[in-house]
Amino acid sequence: MKLKVILNLLKPCILHTIEEIIDYMDVCMHAEVRSVLNAETSPVSALRLHSTLGRDIRNKFSLWNHNNVACRKFHKENNELYHPDSVSQYIINELVKRIRMQNGLDVKPFELTQIYQTTGNYVAIA
């Protein structure tokens, strides 16, 4: 299934916590994207979503801005170096958990690390 425009990218949305971003996404997400997150949990799906939904999340919520308040809080709380890819992947994982729980399904978040461990390669993802 090819995903179309996922978020309205014309207006960036600045929120102050990652939880606010997840809540916003949960409310505003298209039904098509919700069904994909509900159904697919393979590493290949994770990579595809990272390149589509993840990109849109990074752009919509200005995650590439290193002064982004939500990202700075997230990385400080998790003792991680800042990278927009890790924040968008965390958001996708949390959305998968939330949507699958709402539908009474097993909670199995996407894990890009599975792809890296399987192939032994690190892939540059924009």
Residue map of PLM features:
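N-terminal export/targeting and maturation segments
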Residues: 1-37
